[in-house]
Amino acid sequence: MTATAPVKTEYEAVIGLETHVQLGTATKIFSNASTEFGADPNTHIDPVVLGLPGTLPVLNQKVLEYAVKAGLALNCQIAPYSKFDRKQYFYPDLPKNYQISQYDLPIAEHGWIEIEVAEKGKEPYTKKIGVTRLHMEEDAGKLVHAGSDRLAGSTHSLVDYNRAGVALAEIVSEPDLRTGKEAAEYAQELRRIMRYLGVSDGNMAEGSLRCDVNISIRPKGTEKFGTKVEIKYMNSFNAIQRAIEFEIERQIRCLETGEPIVQETRLWDEGKQVTKSMRSKEGSSDYRYFPEPDLGPIEVSETQRETWRSELPELPAQKRHRYAEQYGLSAYDARVLTDEKSTADYYEATVAAGADAKQAANWLMGDIAAYVNANKLLVSDLPLQPQDLAELVNLIEAGTISGKIAKEILPELLEKGGSPKAIVEAKGLTQISDPAQIEALVDELLAAHPTELEQFRAGKTKLQGFFVGQLMKKTGGRVDPKLSNQILNQKLKG
């Protein structure tokens, strides 16, 4: 009797993200100390930040506004009553030895966002990801380890309290994510929403947006969760995806070899592209939460909530859907144009100024995007105004200039701005579209190249490209390409 081969178990990952978003207020959450990034160490501190005896925290009302607006944008229920709590732990970057956070009564709960996932070789799909909660808290300081980028290997450590007390919104997702790609898309969509709202710049390099990943593995088709592992220190969306993909493989390998998966916190080593064990994972009981005695309860009235709701901008997902319907753009084009609010605003202003929607999109996603990215700018920083881009698009559409001429004058427009029409007229770049004028130019060209003309008529048809190139050279690229090709074809065939 032939033995059947064992069926290989298929596994799936269960992933949730905890995202810390620095709220872009001018002062800290409980004090008047500045939140400016990049200042000299320990210059943006005060007695409240340091927790000196006799000081009392006072909630920055702008933080509450930003947190509620973020919660509304994430389709959360806003709590009419919430409170702050003390989260107790000892670490050098925490000057009070406790962090003021929110525990059992967060400001926002039970939300969701929709992500669009496009993986190479697979059909794109949308997925709704639950948002468990959003709560307010204060950031910790920052440790600098001399001689190493980590504590291990350093000779000594320094602490900078400038970041301590900066307002954070911690956004916790449901464990609805299944792949590294989904997690990266979720984090990017969160960043887009926060930037559209204007509540955060979402700058990962400066720590304005930081993600911790919780991940476990289980056999497909089962409901029970596996042992959860937390991953920290991913400083880009690509790093989030790669860290998760590595950790999925590591945990599957553990299950298949019988090695136990330990509940722990691991760090992502960008250089080696691996996760490394950092410490055992704490539970909430380890923090000994209790209500913050120095702050009163937080109350948000229905009137205040609805006032803030009315101030929300059109969000990225809404814009994407509208661009597809109103402008007839592809899902890809709509996604690119709405990635940054400044680009979306610029695009809409260009179309409103009379430009064809698709042509305006092509210019913004092509040559203009290349210039903006190379110079680390936003589209809104450009001297080229939306109405001037619309004028450029319309000059091409009307046949006044060719696309080639438009590309030639674009660098000047991007660097100095101005009217494309005025530049074209001043430089004599208007397109030659008169059939009689083009015919005369073609006659001159053929008369100047009798040998090539004879070879073409003898069957060497590839020489047509030669004649096209010579005509463009003769006219400086100003001749109407479609009309000139028609006339050239007629003349070449005799």
From Swiss-Prot:
Query: Enzyme group, top EC level?
Result: ligase
What PROSITE patterns does the record point to?
GATB
SUPFAM superfamilies reported for this sequence? GatB/YqeY motif (SSF89095), Glutamine synthetase/guanido kinase (SSF55931)
Q: Does the keyword Nucleotide-binding apply?
A: yes
> Per the UniProt record, which EC number(s) apply here?
6.3.5.-
Report the GO molecular function annotations.
Answer: asparaginyl-tRNA synthase (glutamine-hydrolyzing) activity; ATP binding; glutaminyl-tRNA synthase (glutamine-hydrolyzing) activity
Catalyzed reactions: L-glutamyl-tRNA(Gln) + L-glutamine + ATP + H2O = L-glutaminyl-tRNA(Gln) + L-glutamate + ADP + phosphate + H(+); L-aspartyl-tRNA(Asn) + L-glutamine + ATP + H2O = L-asparaginyl-tRNA(Asn) + L-glutamate + ADP + phosphate + 2 H(+)
Annotated keywords: ATP-binding, Ligase, Nucleotide-binding, Protein biosynthesis
Under the heading InterPro entries, the entry gives: Asn/Gln-tRNA_amidoTrfase_suB/E, Asn/Gln-tRNA_Trfase_suB/E_cat, Asn/Gln_amidotransferase, Asn/Gln_tRNA_amidoTrase-B-like, GatB, GatB_C_1, GatB_Yqey_C_2, Gln-tRNA_amidoTrfase_suB_CS
- HAMAP family the record matches: GatB
Main function:
Allows the formation of correctly charged Asn-tRNA(Asn) or Gln-tRNA(Gln) through the transamidation of misacylated Asp-tRNA(Asn) or Glu-tRNA(Gln) in organisms which lack either or both of asparaginyl-tRNA or glutaminyl-tRNA synthetases. The reaction takes place in the presence of glutamine and ATP through an activated phospho-Asp-tRNA(Asn) or phospho-Glu-tRNA(Gln).
Subunit organization: Heterotrimer of A, B and C subunits.
* Protein name, per record: Aspartyl/glutamyl-tRNA(Asn/Gln) amidotransferase subunit B
